[in-house]
């Protein structure tokens, strides 16, 4: 038998990219229905027929007042909820009605975000080699990844990965996965989509489940998409952020801190421990592991993209690390204008950061800083840590069309 003409090592080398994975475009989308936080307690208790629960309504109003959220977007309209009263009850069987919404609307909202990212990228859809789709909203077969592939007209040979029921940390997870795909497949262009709709978690209030009410005060709907690829062709592609390293960790002594369970009543949400305290207690270790190899110990000298699980998390992280308030500006802006959109949040923050950096005349997409960190926090407690490197801003760059 004739000897092989190439070695495995040569094949492996040819398969791999040379440079780091890079974010090449970002797109975001929300439902049209906008809910202002100041009006939400009255609306929420009226639509769930809970106005007789006056003390609970006052508690909920205080939650909303402290949330630092100005407005959110929600697919569920008052008209739809009026037609589906079981979704408004605290624990009424309603999974079928919820599923009917999310299996259609999750890929549809994802499509809107993906189209914006593809338009900014400016390359033919046929160049997309991989699709990573993430949602905590509903499960179906074939999944939202398949539906989006059909909706966008992607090649039938696109390599798909569907991630269901990950939770709020997954905006970091999808970037970690996309980094590995882009760097280990020369020429790969990965479309990443996070699409979240609260139709699975919406329900009426209960004195016995106040942590569910916390979710009702915080969560909103949104989708975000990014194009990730290594070795960008800068004649036609515009790098935004490089993905330098990525890791995932389960925090010690945090089991049960955040749980979600899919039941006949929908997705139930449970906060069982001091989540802000657990995250802030472990944040320095995560930062040291990520930035010590780079010789960075001043965390005010990097840009910050942190999942805004709630204002208390951001407050305690700031205090623990000694952050200047300006470091969390992009994060707090997204919390204020959209609420907690689970996995999509950190991608919204990346979008806000690169746009504001250009508008403010900064030298880089990372608010003038070279290095940055992206944190995802969620069920587990699980933390995703992504080290980012910004790129220089040229005239007209870093702002979407």
Swiss-Prot record:
Entry keyword set: Acyltransferase, Flavonoid biosynthesis, Transferase
- What domain of life is recorded for the organism? Eukaryota
Active-site residues per Swiss-Prot or TrEMBL entry: 168
Reactions listed under catalytic activity: (E)-4-coumaroyl-CoA + 3 malonyl-CoA + 3 H(+) = 2',4,4',6'-tetrahydroxychalcone + 3 CO2 + 4 CoA
InterPro entries the UniProt entry points to: Chalcone/stilbene_synt_C, Chalcone/stilbene_synt_N, Chalcone/stilbene_synthase_AS, Polyketide_synthase_type-III, Thiolase-like
Please explain the role this protein plays, according to its UniProt record: The primary product of this enzyme is 4,2',4',6'-tetrahydroxychalcone (also termed naringenin-chalcone or chalcone) which can under specific conditions spontaneously isomerize into naringenin.
Report the GO molecular function annotations. naringenin-chalcone synthase activity
What metabolic or biological pathway is this protein involved in?
Answer: Secondary metabolite biosynthesis; flavonoid biosynthesis
Upper classification of the source organism reads: Eukaryota, Viridiplantae, Streptophyta, Embryophyta, Tracheophyta
Regions crossing the membrane:
none
Recorded family membership: Belongs to the thiolase-like superfamily. Chalcone/stilbene synthases family.
Q: What is this protein called?
A: Chalcone synthase 1
Record EC number: 2.3.1.74
The GO biological-process annotations, alphabetized, read as: flavonoid biosynthetic process
**Signal sequence range:** none
Its gene is CHS1
């Amino acid at each position: 038998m004739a000897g092989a003409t190439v070695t495995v090592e040569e094949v492996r080398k040819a398969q791999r990219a040379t440079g780091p994975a890079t974010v090449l475009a970002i797109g975001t989308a929300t439902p049209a229905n906008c809910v202002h936080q100041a009006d939400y307690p009255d609306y929420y208790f009226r639509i769930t027929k809970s106005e007789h629960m006056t003390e609970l309504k006052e508690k909920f109003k205080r939650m909303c007042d402290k949330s630092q959220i100005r407005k959110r977007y929600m697919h569920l309209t008052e008209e739809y909820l009026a037609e589906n009263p079981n979704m408004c009850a605290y624990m009424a069987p309603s999974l079928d009605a919820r599923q009917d919404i999310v299996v259609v609307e999750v890929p549809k909202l994802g499509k809107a975000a993906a189209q914006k990212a593809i338009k900014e990228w400016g390359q033919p859809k046929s160049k997309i080699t991989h699709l990573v789709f993430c949602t905590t909203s509903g499960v179906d077969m074939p999944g939202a990844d398949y539906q989006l592939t059909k909706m966008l007209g992607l090649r039938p040979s696109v390599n798909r990965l569907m991630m269901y029921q990950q939770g709020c940390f997954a905006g970091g997870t999808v970037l970690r996965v996309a980094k590995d795909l882009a760097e280990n497949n020369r020429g790969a262009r990965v479309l990443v989509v996070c699409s979240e709709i609260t139709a699975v978690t919406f329900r009426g209030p209960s004195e016995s489940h106040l942590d569910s009410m916390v979710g009702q005060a915080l969560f909103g709907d949104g989708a975000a998409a990014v194009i990730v690829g290594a070795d960008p062709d800068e004649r036609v592609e515009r790098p935004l952020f490089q993905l330098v390293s990525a890791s995932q960790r389960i925090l010690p002594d945090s089991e049960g801190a955040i749980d979600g369970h899919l039941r006949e009543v929908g997705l139930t949400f449970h906060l069982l421990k001091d989540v802000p305290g657990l995250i802030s207690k472990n944040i320095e270790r995560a930062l040291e592991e990520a930035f010590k190899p780079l010789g960075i110990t001043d965390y005010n000298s990097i840009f910050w993209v942190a999942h805004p699980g709630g204002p208390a998390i951001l407050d305690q992280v700031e205090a623990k690390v000694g952050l200047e308030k300006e470091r969390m500006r992009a994060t707090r802006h997204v919390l204020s204008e959209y609420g907690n959109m689970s996995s999509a949040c950190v991608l919204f923050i990346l979008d806000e950061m690169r746009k504001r950096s250009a508008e403010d005349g900064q030298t880089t997409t990372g608010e003038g800083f070279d290095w940055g960190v992206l944190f995802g926090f969620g069920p587990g407690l699980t933390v995703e840590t992504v080290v980012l490197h910004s790129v220089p801003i040229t005239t007209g760059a870093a702002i979407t069309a």
